[in-house]
């Protein structure tokens, strides 16, 4: 019985190690911080940082407004009875905010292309195709 228990424990440990190591092979070994990604020249790094800072400055207020509208939308849905005209109005405002954010993202992408910065390049988590979700730091292109 002891021998069977030891074998089972060893097998479980080996399985856990094997499953844990597979993430190292995902995306060609490029991890969260995009190790082994094509390096940017110092000019490209400077341009990337400026483009990123400009995008953040322009989009942060819109993102905060979107979060506020999302809370308002959820509160309106929780009301008894829900006011469909108010809910639709807030949903339309959220749609307009998302569209404005998308337009800013397109402008950012164009600026990066004009600066010769390859898609997926950048500094830090999410500025590459590492399989995250969402925008602004989560790797969606």
Swiss-Prot record:
Gene3D superfamilies: 1.20.120.1490. It is found in: Periplasm. Its main location: periplasm. GO terms for molecular function: cobalt ion binding; copper ion binding; identical protein binding; nickel cation binding; zinc ion binding. Pfam families: Metal_resist. Residues 1-26 form the signal peptide. Keywords: Disulfide bond, Periplasm, Signal, Stress response, Zinc. The keyword Electron transport does not apply. The keyword S-adenosyl-L-methionine does not apply. Zinc binding is required for repressor activity and enhances chaperone activity. Disruption phenotype: Deletion of the gene confers increased susceptibility to five classes of antibiotics and to some environmental stresses targeting the envelope. In the absence of stress, the mutants show no default in membrane integrity or in cell morphology as compared to the wild-type cells. In the presence of drugs that target the envelope, the mutants show enhanced membrane disruption and abnormal cell shape. Deletion does not affect the minimum inhibitory concentration (MIC) of E.coli for zinc or copper. In strain TOP10, disruption mutant exhibits a higher tolerance to zinc concentrations above 0.5 mM. One of its GO terms (biological process) is cellular response to cell envelope stress. Part of the Zra signaling pathway, an envelope stress response (ESR) system composed of the periplasmic accessory protein ZraP, the histidine kinase ZraS and the transcriptional regulator ZraR. The ZraPSR system contributes to antibiotic resistance and is important for membrane integrity in the presence of membrane-targeting biocides. ZraP acts as a modulator which has both a regulatory and a chaperone function. The zinc-bound form of ZraP modulates the response of the ZraPSR system by inhibiting the expression of the zra genes, probably by interacting with ZraS. The N-terminal region contains the metal-binding site and the C-terminal region is involved in oligomerization. Contains two zinc-binding motifs. Binds four zinc or copper equivalents per octomer with high affinity and without change in quaternary structure. Belongs to the ZraP family. This is Signaling pathway modulator ZraP. It comes from Escherichia coli (strain K12). The gene is zraP.
């Amino acid at each position: 019985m002891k021998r069977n228990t030891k074998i089972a424990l060893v097998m479980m440990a080996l399985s856990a190690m094997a499953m844990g190591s597979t993430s190292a092979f995902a995306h060609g070994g490029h991890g969260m911080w995009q190790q082994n990604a094509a390096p940017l020249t110092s000019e490209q790094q400077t341009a990337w940082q400026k483009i990123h800072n400009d995008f953040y400055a322009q989009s942060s207020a819109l993102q905060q407004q979107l979060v506020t509208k999302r809370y308002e939308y959820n509160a309106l849905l929780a009301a008894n009875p829900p006011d469909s005209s108010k809910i639709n109005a807030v949903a339309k405002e959220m749609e307009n905010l998302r569209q404005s954010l998308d337009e800013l993202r397109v402008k950012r992408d164009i600026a990066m292309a004009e600066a010769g910065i390859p898609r997926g390049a950048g500094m830090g988590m999410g500025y590459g195709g590492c399989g995250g979700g969402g925008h602004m730091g989560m790797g969606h292109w």
